[in-house]
Design a protein with these regions (language model features):
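Adenosine-phosphate binding glycine-rich loop
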Residues: 44-49, 269-364
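NAD(P)-binding Rossmann-fold cofactor-contacting core
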Residues: 187-210
Length: 364
């Protein structure tokens, strides 16, 4: 039996009262009662109206579990059906012992979907009872993917950015970008928010949505430098077709907090040279794979086990300190954690049960 710090797997798994399954002896030949799972579609999730605080709390719970050695993460895998489709699938897998759930998420990332009026990232999350392998839930994970990504960015800032940060520069207007800005602003109440993306119609629509929901003016910039230079917090969530050093290291002011997580690298190799602390969500995922904003830095040895300060879960769990002074210039690179998907999926299931939302489907 795998043993976790201070607990065994059986100790760690809470009783899953919400799983409506009835097991019988399959070898006896007696009829087996229906095995049910919960299905939450996008409309159900929208009706739940998860608050910013609920989203951040759910994701931080998974980070703390990770930092305490109570999780299992399998490195993500990719499927590229055809280069002509300009997209790929990511498959994320994990287990969160304190929640008693294992999960597998499949998310499609198709850059040209905007031409069809579709989101670029659409996902499904499957949750399972880790003791039996039985399915617990199937959830539309498009919201989960967007919101948990923003929560990771915000939690990274909570531990690694200056507390008096007042200017945010955000590159990119994809689905996750909205939640980056919204959840960061929920923690910092910025005086100035700047946004930029490649397509004018995209960045203008992004700014309009933020102004409506945050109730403050958003500055739309015409170029990367105007967005980034002098900002206290910089988030790079671009969608480049191939690596290109669009974000210049000289634009980053001392004491800033930088979050690069675009699929393709958009930063200079010298970016890591100015950093006090470099933190990732999961080193196992970051050190390999086809994609990632700091892939070239890993391959060049600029980001390694020796130069890495730690994983965000270690900081969230109190095992390592976060920012220690205003002079630090810190970086957080996240590839996306299956643990965050599972934790937010769990929070949605709990709230859906309280609100009477979702459908019970017969699995077997």
């Amino acid at each position: 039996m795998r043993t976790y710090k201070h607990m065994t797997v059986n100790d760690a798994i809470p009783k899953l009262d919400s799983i409506e399954t009835q097991h019988t002896d399959l070898e006896s030949g007696d009829p087996m009662a229906d095995i049910l799972l919960t299905y939450l579609n996008g409309r159900d999730i929208a009706r739940l109206k998860m608050t910013d605080a609920e989203i951040i709390a759910a994701v931080e719970q998974a980070l703390v579990a990770q930092g305490n050695g109570q999780t299992v993460i399998e490195p993500r895998v990719h499927l590229m059906p055809d280069p002509a489709f300009n997209g790929h699938f990511n498959v994320l897998r994990g287990y969160v012992a304190p929640l008693g759930l294992a999960g597998v998420k499949v998310v499609g990332d198709f850059v040209d979907n905007y031409k069809l009026g579709l989101p670029s990232e659409m996902a499904m999350l499957n949750l399972f009872d880790p003791r039996t392998g039985m399915p617990v839930a199937v959830i539309d994970a498009t919201f989960i993917t967007d919101a948990r990504t923003g929560a990771l960015t915000a939690i990274g800032a909570k531990h690694l950015a200056r507390r008096d940060s007042k200017v945010l520069g955000h590159i990119g207007a994809r689905g996750t970008s909205y939640w980056n800005v919204r959840l960061l602003d929920s923690l910092y109440d910025f005086d100035e928010i700047r946004v930029h993306s490649r397509r004018p119609e995209s960045r203008n629509a992004f700014a309009a949505r933020l102004e409506r929901d945050l109730g403050k003016k958003i500055v739309v910039t015409e170029d990367w430098e105007s967005c980034v230079r002098g900002a206290d917090i910089v988030v790079e969530a671009s969608r480049l077709e191939r690596p290109a050093p669009m974000l210049k290291t000289e634009w980053i002011k001392p004491g800033a907090f930088v979050v690069p997580y675009g699929t393709m690298s958009a930063v200079e190799l010298s970016l890591t040279d100015i950093m006090t602390r470099m933190v990732v969500d999961d080193w196992g995922q970051c050190k390999g794979g086809m994609f990632g904003s700091l892939r070239a830095h890993v391959e060049a040895g600029k980001l390694s086990e020796q130069t890495l300060y730690g994983e965000l879960g270690e900081i969230a769990a109190g095992r390592k300190p976060g920012r220690q002074s205003d002079d630090e210039t810190n970086l957080f690179w996240h590839r996306g954690l299956s643990l965050s998907d599972i934790a937010l999926g769990h929070a949605l299931l709990e709230k859906a049960a309280e609100c009477g939302l979702g459908q019970k489907l017969v699995y077997a």
